[in-house]
Amino acid sequence: MARVKRAVNARKNHKKVLKLAKGYYGGKSKLFKTANESVIRALRNAYVGRRLKKRDYRRLWIARINAATRMNGLSYSRFMNGMKLAGVDINRKMLSEIAINDPKAFADLVELAKKHLNA
């Protein structure tokens, strides 16, 4: 069987990994083996982080909406139920923005939800 020489491919792979590891501390930016381990871990953490970010933002929006609705005399879950009954389809991100930037408009939304809960 013929001997496989991987000089070009190995050099290309090493350069790619070391480029990704640029800025890492010590041997993690200089030595291929440790750099490769660090890069694999970093890419995995970045992948997981992108998914966790979505959860974190949703929790933040809900906490903001809950705080604003309680200031207007209603709980978050009853507010969302009232909004659904009223046929208002505004997502949580926009509701939290309204709660922060326009409290008067948000108070009107809470009143609308209360009206549909009692009806």
From Swiss-Prot:
Q: SUPFAM superfamilies, alphabetically?
A: Ribosomal protein L20
Q: Which gene encodes it?
A: rplT
Please give the Pfam families that the UniProt record associates with this protein. Answer: Ribosomal_L20 (PF00453)
Q: Which Gene3D superfamilies does the entry link to?
A: 6.10.160.10, Ribosomal protein L20
What organism does the UniProt record list as the source?
Clostridium perfringens (strain 13 / Type A)
Q: What is this protein called?
A: Large ribosomal subunit protein bL20
The UniProt keywords, alphabetically, are: Ribonucleoprotein, Ribosomal protein, RNA-binding, rRNA-binding
> Which residues span the membrane?
none
* Swiss-Prot/TrEMBL GO biological process terms: ribosomal large subunit assembly; translation
Which PANTHER family does the annotation name?
39S RIBOSOMAL PROTEIN L20
